[in-house]
Design a protein with these regions (language model features):
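A short, N-terminal "cap"/entry segment at the start of jelly-roll beta-barrel domains
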Residues: 6-109
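Double-stranded beta-helix
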Residues: 10-16, 173-200
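Short, conserved beta-strand element in jelly-roll/cupin
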Residues: 110, 115-121, 128-144, 183
Length: 200
């Protein structure tokens, strides 16, 4: 990797810390870990974001950091959190990159942090995992279901917080979305469970 790319990625990752400006411990943990990043390098692979996700990232209400994200040569792929065939089927409309974590561009055993988006008119069903988690919306809109509560729409700067083992689901309607997320606690995916779409 050339030096400019390495510097740009490190600066970008450090800038992500400013997004986690809430008072809850998970956001404080994200800020602490991001502030420690001393080196970051791009993967040798690259896959572009879908046009429908890029479009919402260029809207006037998108978080300013989206302008940097679209310039990064990331390898955007559906996540592989579960080996379940149903999970794989319900992941083809997702775009994801783990930036910091056990599988990230920056290695960490304290957090998993990445960028995650979905195409419009898509639904990612109910899942649970030991890690505590928060998503911060960067562009577009996403409807989040937490526990037994109904779906709630979140837009840029909105948050969806999921304590350990809380069932949660997400879906889009007319718009795609882009977000940044962080896991803390048990970062293993061994106990991740995906149960499919919520019952109507």
């Amino acid at each position: 990797m050339n030096a400019p790319n390495s510097i740009n990625l490190k600066s970008f990752v450090l800038n992500l810390a400013d997004l986690f400006d809430g008072d809850i411990e998970i956001e404080k943990a994200a800020r602490r870990e991001l502030s420690k990043v001393s080196e970051a390098n791009f993967s040798s692979k690259q896959c572009a974001l879908p046009a429908q996700i890029l479009s919402v990232m260029q809207q006037s209400d998108a978080h300013p950091i989206c302008a940097d994200i679209v310039e990064m040569p990331f390898d955007w792929r559906p996540p592989e959190t579960s080996k379940s065939p149903l999970y794989a089927k319900h992941s083809i409309f997702k775009s994801h990159i783990e930036l910091v974590g056990p599988d990230g561009l920056v290695e960490s055993d304290s957090i998993r942090l990445g960028l995650y988006g979905m195409l419009p008119n898509s639904e990612y069903g109910v899942r649970t995992h030991p890690a505590e988690e928060i998503y911060i919306m960067l562009a577009g809109e996403c409807f989040w279901k937490r526990g037994d509560a109904p779906y709630c729409c979140e837009r840029p700067n909105g948050r969806s917080y999921h304590p350990s083992m809380m069932p949660h689901a997400s879906k889009t309607e007319d718009q795609s979305f882009m977000s940044v997320y962080v896991w803390v606690g048990d970062l293993s995916t061994d106990a991740y469970e995906y149960s499919g779409l919520p019952q109507k």
